[in-house]
């Protein structure tokens, strides 16, 4: 077992006073807590010691030291100090079976003793993380984390991208130690493949701020994807073109198939795995080339349209943006501009027509008034004749 640190908490002081002859002598002990494999010091403090016999015994009441002399052949126990003020022994490589009460006995006419209680804690080892079944994109994955031995029972936590995941924990006592397990379940996608999940274990046997961690790398299986990359954008007769089929997938497709539409590949073509080499291009090599890949989760296919130009032809390199998309965007912009222009013309015509109508109406009224003014007398006569 690896080397562990020694831990001591605020200790309960136990006092005993000898009565009768030899009164005034006192023995004081301190409780000790240590991590398994660590070093513990058990101390008996003496007050007004007069040289009486001092005996140190283990929890089984076996004498370890008698007045400073070794009585039990266990080299893990060493006498560090024997003085009128203090008796101190050192225990290395502490074990669970060492736990219990250690007796400091002072023999005068009456026997007096105090007990120093040794508590042994067990730090958790690195957790064991396992997956219940293979993770597939769109499904759920269930992970389990196990710490088979700790004391007190370890606390388990899950982390993903520095965020804590909620797990379900259970514990079982096995003698003096505890076995603790935790499970976590969550949905995964292809982007989660290779992600890190951490299971962390902590208890009081570890130094403050320390923990034991195990990282689990997610293995998420998903259907393949394929894309063809050309060694050059513009090819002319006599050039050599290399097409590369970039494939992803888990499990990775182990076979890639090259085709040219409904025709066979040119005799000069050399297909090796992900690459297709077309040397000495001629116009007869024109066509749609495809690469195909598959795994148990699906199938992928990529297309490349080969156009071989004359050596002296002036052409522009193909862009990565499909012409159909660019054409669609331009058509939409033209349509919007036409709609705006039509709306502006319609509003202008309507406003102008309304203005002309009002203007003509105003002229008619003014003309009638002027005519009435000029022919006022005749009109009056006509009105008189009408009424007569």
Curated annotation (Swiss-Prot):
Residue ranges of every copy of the Ig-like C2-type domain listed in the record: 124-219, 224-307
Q: Which UniProt keywords apply?
A: Cell adhesion, Disulfide bond, Glycoprotein, Immunoglobulin domain, Membrane, Phosphoprotein, Repeat, Signal, Transmembrane, Transmembrane helix, Tumor suppressor
Note the topology in the membrane: Single-pass type I membrane protein
The UniProt transmembrane annotation reads: 325-345
Task: Look up the signal peptide feature and give its range.
Answer: 1-20
Cell compartment(s), UniProt? Membrane
Recount the PTM note: N-glycosylated.
Residues modified to Phosphoserine: 361
Would you list which residues are glycosylated?
A: 31, 67, 286
An example of a Gene Ontology cellular component annotation for this protein is: cell-cell contact zone
Residues in the Cytoplasmic compartment per record = 346-388
For this UniProt entry, the molecular function terms from Gene Ontology, in alphabetical order, are:
protein phosphatase binding; receptor tyrosine kinase binding; vascular endothelial growth factor receptor 1 binding; vascular endothelial growth factor receptor 2 binding
Occurrences of domain Ig-like V-type (ranges): 21-119
Which regions of this chain are Extracellular-facing, per the record's topological domains? 21-324
SMART domains noted in UniProt: 4.1m (SM00294), IG (SM00409), IGc2 (SM00408)
**Tissue-wise expression:** Expressed in brain, prostate, brain, kidney and some other organs.
Quaternary organization? Monomer and homodimer.
- What name does the UniProt record give this protein? Cell adhesion molecule 4
């Amino acid at each position: 077992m690896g080397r562990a640190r020694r831990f001591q908490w605020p200790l309960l002081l136990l006092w005993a006073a000898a009565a009768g002859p030899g009164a005034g002598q006192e023995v004081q002990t301190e409780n000790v807590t240590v991590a398994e494999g660590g070093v513990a010091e058990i101390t008996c403090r003496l007050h007004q010691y007069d040289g009486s016999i001092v005996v140190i015994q283990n929890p089984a009441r076996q004498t370890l030291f008698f007045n400073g002399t070794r009585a039990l052949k266990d080299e893990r126990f060493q006498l560090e100090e024997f003085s009128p003020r203090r008796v101190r022994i050192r225990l290395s490589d502490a074990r669970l079976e060492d736990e219990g009460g250690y007796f400091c006995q002072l023999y005068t006419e009456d026997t007096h003793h105090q007990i120093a209680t040794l508590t042994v804690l067990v730090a958790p080892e690195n957790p064991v993380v396992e997956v219940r079944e293979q993770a597939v994109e769109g499904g759920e994955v269930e992970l389990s984390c196990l710490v088979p031995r700790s004391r007190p029972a370890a606390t388990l936590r899950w982390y993903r991208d520095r965020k804590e995941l909620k797990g379900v924990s259970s514990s079982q006592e096995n003698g003096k130690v505890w076995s603790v397990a935790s499970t976590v379940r969550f949905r995964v996608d292809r982007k989660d493949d290779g992600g890190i999940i951490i299971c962390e274990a902590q208890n009081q046997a570890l130094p403050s701020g320390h923990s034991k961690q195990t990282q689990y790398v997610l293995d998420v299986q998903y259907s393949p994807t394929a894309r063809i990359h050309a060694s050059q954008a513009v090819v002319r007769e006599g050039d050599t073109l290399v097409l590369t089929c970039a494939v992803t997938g888990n499990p990775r497709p182990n076979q890639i198939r090259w085709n040219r539409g409904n025709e066979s590949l040119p005799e000069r073509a050399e297909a090796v795995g992900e690459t297709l080499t077309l040397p000495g291009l001629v116009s007869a090599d024109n066509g749609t080339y495809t690469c195909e890949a598959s795994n148990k989760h699906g199938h992928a296919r990529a297309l490349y349209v080969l156009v071989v130009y004359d050596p002296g032809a002036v052409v522009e390199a193909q862009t990565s943006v499909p012409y159909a998309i660019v054409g669609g965007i331009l058509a939409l912009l033209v349509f919007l501009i036409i709609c705006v222009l039509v709306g502006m013309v319609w509003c202008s015509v309507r406003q102008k027509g309304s203005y002309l109508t009002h203007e003509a109406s105003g002229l008619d009224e003014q003309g009638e008034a002027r005519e009435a003014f000029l022919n006022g007398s005749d009109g009056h006569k006509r009105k008189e004749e009408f009424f007569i």
